[in-house]
Amino acid sequence: MSDSPVKKGRGRPAKAKPEETASPKAAKKEEKKVEEVPKKIEESTKPENGAAPKKGRGRPSKGDKAAPKRPASGKGRGRPAKNAKKVDDADTEEVNSSD
């Protein structure tokens, strides 16, 4: 068998000691000096064709309403609003004007 300790369980392995992890070759290497290269900064982030920035990215803000759902073909706009149900007003005007 090898010199390595016997692994008894499937748990997380013990943390290695710094003496074991450091190799003698790593100590001999000299640190290389890194030259800082200036990155090219783009002048503008706008698209070239002049299009508006895309919407619908990420989570919507808290006050935003949900987008209106597209009705199936031939179904109209669904249930009318509550304030649009007053239809009796037209009938009462005809009766009042005949007097």
UniProtKB/Swiss-Prot annotation:
It comes from the Eukaryota. Residues 16-46 have a biased composition (Basic and acidic residues). Phosphorylated in a cell-cycle dependent manner; substantially reduced in cells that have finished proliferating and are differentiated. Phosphorylation at Ser-4 and Ser-23 results in a 10-fold weakening of DNA-binding activity and altered the mode of protein-DNA interaction. GO terms for cellular component: chromosome; nucleolus; transcription regulator complex. It is found in: Nucleus, Nucleolus; Chromosome. Residues 7-19, 54-66, 74-86 bind DNA. The keyword Nucleus applies. Its main location: nucleus. Keywords: Chromosome, DNA-binding, Nucleus, Phosphoprotein, Repeat, Transcription, Transcription regulation. Residues 1-99 are annotated as: Disordered. One of its GO terms (molecular function) is minor groove of adenine-thymine-rich DNA binding. InterPro entries: AT_hook_DNA-bd_motif. Belongs to the HMGA family. Binds preferentially to the minor groove of A+T rich regions in double-stranded DNA via the second and third DBA-binding domains. It is suggested that these proteins could function in nucleosome phasing and in the 3'-end processing of mRNA transcripts. They are also involved in the transcription regulation of genes containing, or in close proximity to A+T-rich regions. This is High mobility group protein I.
